[in-house]
Amino acid sequence: MVDHKRIPKQVIVGVSGGIAAYKACTVVRQLTEASHRVRVIPTESALRFVGAATFEALSGEPVCTDVFADVPAVPHVHLGQQADLVVVAPATADLLARAAAGRADDLLTATLLTARCPVLFAPAMHTEMWLHPATVDNVATLRRRGAVVLEPATGRLTGADSGAGRLPEAEEITTLAQLLLERHDALPYDLAGRKLLVTAGGTREPIDPVRFIGNRSSGKQGYAVARVAAQRGADVTLIAGHTAGLVDPAGVEVVHVSSAQQLADAVSKHAPTADVLVMAAAVADFRPAQVATAKIKKGVEGPPTIELLRNDDVLAGVVRARAHGQLPNMRAIVGFAAETGDANGDVLFHARAKLRRKGCDLLVVNAVGEGRAFEVDSNDGWLLASDGTESALQHGSKTLMASRIVDAIVTFLAGCSS
């Protein structure tokens, strides 16, 4: 039986002429290492920053530069027709303008017109150019036509400038590229005007200056939800506990915390303005009653006894606050449950009980175990709703899982509005 998910995809990487063109090399390398066939189409100005030989060495494929290089092959038609995905990184203000206008004055823009696959633009330009009304209109036009235009990162630009307009990290671009290949369609821009509050990662409760109580959460699933929601138009705030060295998603406000109390305080601060809470963080249930100011020594009397106190349930607290009218904007509350079966019942038995106990609108359920849920890049599980409906979340990347979760949130919000 053929595993279609493992069949290499045809990916075109378009590179336009900006200083960030050198970062396209990492995008090409990562997509190639993911076993995709990558064809690079640089603009003439892009080749002034990075030579064709570099792209050919990284992709293992000849670089395509000229509509007339192989006239019988009609490259400006066939490249777009055969592609499973087109990624343009970096996409300059000029490239976005030409794409929005439907220009076909070079091989890259001509290929964009013939492509029938998802198209992903990763913009890079100075802040003033990104915020200019012309660029804003061009981006809106491309999104309206179904293209995915990433929000640029904020940081150091060329020269001494700093601000919004920096090319998103290569990992960000390739992660979303892989999602588009898994979804087989573009990401809808359907969360514009919505504010999402997402928590991710694990908390740490200090025992002494060296030791802490923690858990195995990597934060990958929560980060993926924040990333996907932002690229679907949401205004996202991500409250991040300890993670596996993850790159902060572009276009997302990230608040870093350590302990359960810090996370609870951050949620209390940001929840009043949020439409949706996605509680993906693994929050410690207990904390030491006292934190030692010096490292606890082994001693000769045996291991020390540590008295524990129960932490407040952050998710249940938000549900109560909404019920008491304290969160009038909150339309959807999404919880997460990492469960194992036991003598009393299976994973879903415990998950259904948790949904009733917590009172959230949606509950994402993962069965945990060796090589499952924690510290891995893929996931599966179930999605339970407060109305009793249940659906399976088929195995896939955590980014694909995030996309399905966001799909469910959009559907739930539509039901609230009807």
Curated annotation (Swiss-Prot):
Keywords: Decarboxylase, Flavoprotein, FMN, Ligase, Lyase, Magnesium, Metal-binding, Multifunctional enzyme. Its EC number is 4.1.1.36, 6.3.2.5. Gene3D superfamilies: CoaB-like (3.40.50.10300), Flavin prenyltransferase-like (3.40.50.1950). One of its GO terms (cellular component) is plasma membrane. GO terms for molecular function: FMN binding; metal ion binding; phosphopantothenate--cysteine ligase activity; phosphopantothenoylcysteine decarboxylase activity. CTP binds at D285, K295, F336, K354, K358. The keyword RNA-binding does not apply. GO terms for biological process: coenzyme A biosynthetic process; pantothenate catabolic process. Binds 1 FMN per subunit. Disruption phenotype: Transcriptional silencing of this gene leads to growth attenuation and results in a bactericidal phenotype in vitro and in vivo, whether initiated at infection or during either the acute or chronic stages of infection. It catalyses: N-[(R)-4-phosphopantothenoyl]-L-cysteine + H(+) = (R)-4'-phosphopantetheine + CO2; (R)-4'-phosphopantothenate + L-cysteine + CTP = N-[(R)-4-phosphopantothenoyl]-L-cysteine + CMP + diphosphate + H(+). Inhibited by coenzyme A (CoA) and CoA thioesthers. Two related chemical scaffolds that potently inhibit the activity of the CoaB moiety of CoaBC through a cryptic allosteric site that sits in the dimer interface region of the CoaB enzyme were identified. Residues 196-418 are annotated as: Phosphopantothenate--cysteine ligase. In the N-terminal section; belongs to the HFCD (homo-oligomeric flavin containing Cys decarboxylase) superfamily. Catalyzes two sequential steps in the biosynthesis of coenzyme A. In the first step cysteine is conjugated to 4'-phosphopantothenate to form 4-phosphopantothenoylcysteine. In the second step the latter compound is decarboxylated to form 4'-phosphopantotheine. Required for growth and persistence in mice. This is Coenzyme A biosynthesis bifunctional protein CoaBC. It comes from Mycobacterium tuberculosis (strain ATCC 25618 / H37Rv).
